């Protein structure tokens, strides 16, 4: 009997060791962190000193996120995900993290809305999203299983727009302690005024998307200097907004724009993302 009990104890111990060693590959953990604070400029600090004032450093906004990681100790390359103007949805909170973890990446999905009591930003803007992305990067820099030198930023729709804003030359990126290595933007709103990029970027758009017109992305690419990191633009024919999201198998119209899943194009885009991340985060 003692032998049997001891054997059961060893089995249980082995089971717990496997279960508790890190996070399982298909699980996510609710984490809390802050958006990157808006740093005080040297000029503002200098003027305050001249007037005998002491300025306190601004604080970031408290945020929630969902952290997933492959099994093992790492350090792993990682991807920060930014949702669109409608907030969290299945494909961003679950499907993309599962996919990326299976490819060997740690993933942090940023929830920009819950702590701000925001439902959506489809008719407004939230410029703080860029600071949310860098707050997530700061959080990942403190995780010993993440290789902070190999982190990509990836956003969808409004999150894709924030991704482009957060990786443009002479933008807020230059004020941040940590930098992204690459960026992926699904159906973002591009602007020629965004200029050169600070990292290689992959943009994926549909030619029937009138919410995030691909033509604007073409215009930006046409104005890149020879010194800019490469921006790859994939435009898919006959494709609308949210083409990678199975939630929209039945297309719907929102604010005059069509959201519709396209499984064939989704698979093509997923393959492009995998190759792009492998190219720029491999070492």
Predicted regions and their residues:
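Short glycine-enriched nucleophile-adjacent loop
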Residues: 160-174
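Alpha/beta-hydrolase fold nucleophile elbow
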Residues: 146-157
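N-terminal cap/lid segment of alpha/beta-hydrolase-fold proteins
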Residues: 26-73
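C-terminal catalytic histidine-bearing segment of alpha/beta-hydrolase fold enzymes
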Residues: 230-283
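Short beta-strand/loop motif that positions the catalytic acidic residue
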Residues: 203-205
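Short substrate-entry loop that stabilizes the transition state in hydrolases
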Residues: 74-76, 81-119, 210-214
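Short alpha-helix in the alpha/beta-hydrolase fold that links the catalytic acid
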Residues: 199, 213-223
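Alpha/beta-hydrolase active-site loop
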Residues: 123-144, 165
């Amino acid at each position: 009997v003692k032998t049997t009990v001891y054997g059961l104890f060893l089995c249980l111990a082995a089971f717990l060791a496997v279960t508790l060693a890190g996070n399982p590959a298909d699980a996510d953990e609710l984490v809390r962190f802050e958006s990157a604070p808006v740093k005080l400029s040297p000029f503002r600090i200098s003027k305050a000193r001249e007037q005998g004032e002491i300025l306190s450093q601004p604080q970031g906004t408290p945020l929630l996120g969902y952290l997933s990681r492959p099994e093992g100790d790492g350090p792993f390359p990682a991807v920060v995900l930014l949702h669109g103007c409608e907030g969290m949805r299945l494909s961003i909170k679950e499907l993309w993290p599962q996919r990326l973890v299976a490819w060997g990446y740690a993933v942090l999905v940023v929830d920009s809305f819950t702590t701000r009591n925001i439902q959506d930003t489809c008719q407004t803007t939230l410029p703080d999203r860029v600071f949310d992305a860098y707050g997530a990067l700061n959080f990942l820099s403190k995780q010993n299983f993440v290789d902070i030198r190999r982190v990509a930023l990836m956003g969808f729709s409004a999150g894709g727009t924030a991704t482009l804003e957060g990786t443009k030359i002479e933008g807020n990126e230059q004020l941040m302690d940590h930098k992204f290595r690459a960026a992926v933007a699904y159906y973002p709103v591009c602007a020629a005024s965004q200029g050169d990029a600070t990292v290689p970027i992959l943009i994926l758009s549909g030619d029937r998307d009138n919410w995030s017109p691909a033509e604007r992305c073409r215009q930006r690419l046409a104005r890149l200097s020879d010194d800019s990191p490469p921006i790859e633009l994939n435009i898919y024919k006959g494709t609308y907004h949210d083409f990678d999201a199975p939630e929209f198998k039945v297309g719907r119209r929102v604010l005059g724009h069509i959201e519709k899943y396209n499984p064939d194009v989704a698979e093509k885009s997923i393959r492009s993302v995998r190759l792009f991340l492998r190219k720029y985060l491999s070492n």
